[in-house]
Amino acid sequence: MPQIKDNGADVISRYCPIKLYFWDITESAEQLLGMLPSSYAYHEEVAARFRSEARRKEWLAVRVLLHRVADISEPIAYKESGGPYFVHTPSSVSISHTSHFACLALGNAPFGVDIEQYGAKALALTDKFLKPQEKELVSQTSIAPEQFAVLAWSAKEAVYKAADDVSLGLFQDITIEHVDEPKALLSVRVQHQSDCGVGEVWKVSYVFMPHFVLTLCFKDGERIVRESL
């Protein structure tokens, strides 16, 4: 199914200068393979990487967005950390999947994107990824607890991707400190294991889209947000 259009992407791009592409996955893996250039051995690669049909479709949908919508011919490579990158194309890339949706994001600086489908699972697991003071933030907003839990989980995933540091823990090292609802921004403190001080505060933009929440974090997000206002 073609790229999803939503004003939410326009809102978030005011703060983070990137290109966002979405795909509502209604096709089979074979149909998605048929949309990809034959010059790449995607059929063999996806068969070797994934047994699950759902995971195959998520992976292939991102490649369809890359080649058919973003019009980039270069395949995505992966670092040892698991983060995606291009060898030759001068763009940073981040990807995410949730349920039957896929997201591809392209920018000119390191960043992380995440999408998370709405549901009760995140709320049931808050003790695993939110500190007590983070849970208290929901009472200072108009966001419903279940929706806030999904937002918090997604925001921490976006920060983790932007940091590209496998030693970071979502609970211990990434802490949401403030929610600015009018600007749809979160202030998140990141404490690397190598830090001797109090860490850094990064900005995470968010938007509640019809089927999922979208979050986006730049490593230099505070400067980017400040200069975009």
What do the PLM-derived regions correspond to, one by one?
Residues 1-229:
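Core catalytic alpha/beta fold that binds nucleotide/phospho-ligands
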